[in-house]
Amino acid sequence: MGSISEMVFETCPSPNPIHVMLVSFQGQGHVNPLLRLGKLIASKGLLVTFVTTELWGKKMRQANKIVDGELKPVGSGSIRFEFFDEEWAEDDDRRADFSLYIAHLESVGIREVSKLVRRYEEANEPVSCLINNPFIPWVCHVAEEFNIPCAVLWVQSCACFSAYYHYQDGSVSFPTETEPELDVKLPCVPVLKNDEIPSFLHPSSRFTGFRQAILGQFKNLSKSFCVLIDSFDSLEQEVIDYMSSLCPVKTVGPLFKVARTVTSDVSGDICKSTDKCLEWLDSRPKSSVVYISFGTVAYLKQEQIEEIAHGVLKSGLSFLWVIRPPPHDLKVETHVLPQELKESSAKGKGMIVDWCPQEQVLSHPSVACFVTHCGWNSTMESLSSGVPVVCCPQWGDQVTDAVYLIDVFKTGVRLGRGATEERVVPREEVAEKLLEATVGEKAEELRKNALKWKAEAEAAVAPGGSSDKNFREFVEKLGAGVTKTKDNGY
């Protein structure tokens, strides 16, 4: 039996291929994993329609050759993009209120996605299954309205899935206004301090809209026939086994690693990648470069950026630093790097870019460690590439991921506890942690552990691996005609 990449779905006698519609919340960290899943599904001979907002569509069109509604071949199937107008301009001040925005998006999204489903039904291309990612649980309502099976792609760890599940379920105690420092004891998860749970679940969080949007998915959990998780069994074995006994959780990751096997120019990136950073890495010695990137949403204080920069200089290590303009709705200034760092870069000691192909960078032999915000996509990519990390989490699931990287996976060192700590890590500590992760006995141990997880990730997506098997079963279920069964075996 072949691997995920080799399997081709044998369609039934119907002249129309199975049609799967993927609906994504806007944002690089949401679009990328769902699009990877979409490309994999399409490569098996299915038709995939990928849907997100017009605002994000505009960014994708600028960076990629995307034409709305145009079928793009992917393996034995095809994929196309559809974008719906959410009616608010990018600079609309109402976007800053996430609770207000998410309610508006639900109202518009239900209407527009329903129109799309109806349009394809009338065009004799009925949607067979709807799949969404977190923050837009209303996709399940659309599926229910049209009597279409639905599934979810969870783009955080299974440990975080368990945290939200048990918070919603009420079976585990979480911090409250009266007990804000309560430790959280989830089944099959290490005890988490109050600042180590997904921060949206803490009563002090300003982001109540995020909390409610994610919990909305858990209120609709019984409507989904499957919850796909971008993780792999051996990485979170105990909590995956436990959660699988409660709901239809199936690991299919690392998705980015499997997606590499699909030959396609379809991309959801919003910036054009450059090969200049890869060419520069080619000129550096093995395991000599610190790669620094804090994702597309995490925003560190300017003072902290300056201390990290001076810490890098103090360490004497070469660096590749991605500095991206912050999202418009954050209403904050773009980070400014110290002149000394820019001068060091000009002399060839480092490189500063606004975008880079992170997957390729992390797999480059010159990279010694990754200074990261610990978002799940970056966490999976670092583990699957065998790269140690310096953890600089900010909020959301990042603080929980940092605990796992440091204490469970043992591939990282800590550089702060998150935004709630309200502490600026000094340059001396930054330099110390960078050297700890790149030079000496501790660095060797971190690298050894990271390479172990890289091998485990490869085994998961290889023929017969856990993720390979789960994805096969999922696609076969789509082809057989999904029924709304609630049993955990699909």
Curated annotation (Swiss-Prot):
<feature type="binding site">
    <location>
        <position position="30"/>
    </location>
    <ligand>
        <name>an anthocyanidin</name>
    </ligand>
</feature>
<protein>
    <recommendedName>
        <fullName>UDP-glycosyltransferase 84A1</fullName>
        <ecNumber>2.4.1.120</ecNumber>
        <ecNumber>2.4.1.177</ecNumber>
    </recommendedName>
</protein>
<feature type="binding site">
    <location>
        <position position="377"/>
    </location>
    <ligand>
        <name>UDP-alpha-D-glucose</name>
    </ligand>
</feature>
<feature type="binding site">
    <location>
        <position position="376"/>
    </location>
    <ligand>
        <name>UDP-alpha-D-glucose</name>
    </ligand>
</feature>
<comment type="function">
    <text>UDP-glucosyltransferase that forms glucose esters with phenylpropanoids. Glucosylates 4-coumarate, ferulate, caffeate, sinapate and cinnamate. Can glucosylate the phytotoxic xenobiotic compound 2,4,5-trichlorophenol (TCP).</text>
</comment>
<dbReference type="Pfam" id="PF00201">
    <property type="entry name" value="UDPGT"/>
</dbReference>
<keyword id="KW-0808">Transferase</keyword>
<dbReference type="GO" id="GO:0050284">
    <property type="term" value="F:sinapate 1-glucosyltransferase activity"/>
</dbReference>
<comment type="similarity">
    <text>Belongs to the UDP-glycosyltransferase family.</text>
</comment>
<feature type="binding site">
    <location>
        <position position="397"/>
    </location>
    <ligand>
        <name>UDP-alpha-D-glucose</name>
    </ligand>
</feature>
<dbReference type="InterPro" id="IPR035595">
    <property type="entry name" value="UDP_glycos_trans_CS"/>
</dbReference>
<feature type="binding site">
    <location>
        <position position="398"/>
    </location>
    <ligand>
        <name>UDP-alpha-D-glucose</name>
    </ligand>
</feature>
<feature type="binding site">
    <location>
        <position position="381"/>
    </location>
    <ligand>
        <name>UDP-alpha-D-glucose</name>
    </ligand>
</feature>
<feature type="binding site">
    <location>
        <position position="373"/>
    </location>
    <ligand>
        <name>UDP-alpha-D-glucose</name>
    </ligand>
</feature>
<feature type="active site" description="Proton acceptor">
    <location>
        <position position="30"/>
    </location>
</feature>
<feature type="binding site">
    <location>
        <position position="378"/>
    </location>
    <ligand>
        <name>UDP-alpha-D-glucose</name>
    </ligand>
</feature>
<dbReference type="GO" id="GO:0010224">
    <property type="term" value="P:response to UV-B"/>
</dbReference>
<feature type="binding site">
    <location>
        <position position="396"/>
    </location>
    <ligand>
        <name>an anthocyanidin</name>
    </ligand>
</feature>
<keyword id="KW-0216">Detoxification</keyword>
<keyword id="KW-0328">Glycosyltransferase</keyword>
<dbReference type="GO" id="GO:0035251">
    <property type="term" value="F:UDP-glucosyltransferase activity"/>
</dbReference>
<feature type="binding site">
    <location>
        <position position="358"/>
    </location>
    <ligand>
        <name>UDP-alpha-D-glucose</name>
    </ligand>
</feature>
<dbReference type="InterPro" id="IPR002213">
    <property type="entry name" value="UDP_glucos_trans"/>
</dbReference>
<dbReference type="GO" id="GO:0047218">
    <property type="term" value="F:hydroxycinnamate 4-beta-glucosyltransferase activity"/>
</dbReference>
<dbReference type="GO" id="GO:0009636">
    <property type="term" value="P:response to toxic substance"/>
</dbReference>
<dbReference type="GO" id="GO:0050412">
    <property type="term" value="F:cinnamate beta-D-glucosyltransferase activity"/>
</dbReference>
